[in-house]
């Protein structure tokens, strides 16, 4: 594990200087889930909410959130993203929706925070749209699955930790 890069030698917060780093292709994949009552999941899948198609609204919210990370997380760089994709996998056996986000760019810094934020905001949007029916939903297991590009190389979460 390396040093914490967001602090200087005196412990003061700082934005990492990436001026001298080359722009390379960066990809990050994150996942998370929202667990709910079976009736809530069924209604989502039937597109039965008056507010609209819950998963499509969550997809748009996740994409928008990925594009605004530098305004949400204080020391994140402003990055020109080239792709943001969200996928939703309903899991009726566990009464949940698994959310996956893939974010790409060509930049001197990675897009892990953008992928994690996309997943988180998509889950929050599902919660918001369904809370009138189910206030016991649980958002969890938000994690980085994979990242590539840059100095730190290629990271892939162990298979047993991906679920």
Swiss-Prot record:
CDD domains xref list: MoaC_PE
InterPro entries per UniProt: MoaC, MoaC_bact/euk, MoaC_sf, MoCo_biosynth_MoaA/MoaC, Mopterin_CF_biosynth-C_dom
Leading EC class: lyase
Annotated signal sequence range: none
Residues annotated as catalytic: 128
Enzyme Commission number: 4.6.1.17
GO molecular function list: cyclic pyranopterin monophosphate synthase activity
Assigned keywords, A-Z: Lyase, Molybdenum cofactor biosynthesis
Catalytic activity: (8S)-3',8-cyclo-7,8-dihydroguanosine 5'-triphosphate = cyclic pyranopterin phosphate + diphosphate
Name of a matching Pfam family: MoaC
Pathway assigned to this chain's UniProt record: Cofactor biosynthesis; molybdopterin biosynthesis
Similarity remark: Belongs to the MoaC family.
PANTHER family: CYCLIC PYRANOPTERIN MONOPHOSPHATE SYNTHASE (PTHR22960:SF29), MOLYBDOPTERIN COFACTOR SYNTHESIS PROTEIN A (PTHR22960)
Assembly mode: Homohexamer; trimer of dimers.
Annotated HAMAP family: MoaC_B (MF_01224_B)
Function according to Swiss-Prot or TrEMBL: Catalyzes the conversion of (8S)-3',8-cyclo-7,8-dihydroguanosine 5'-triphosphate to cyclic pyranopterin monophosphate (cPMP).
Protein name: Cyclic pyranopterin monophosphate synthase
Protein species of origin: Magnetococcus marinus (strain ATCC BAA-1437 / JCM 17883 / MC-1)
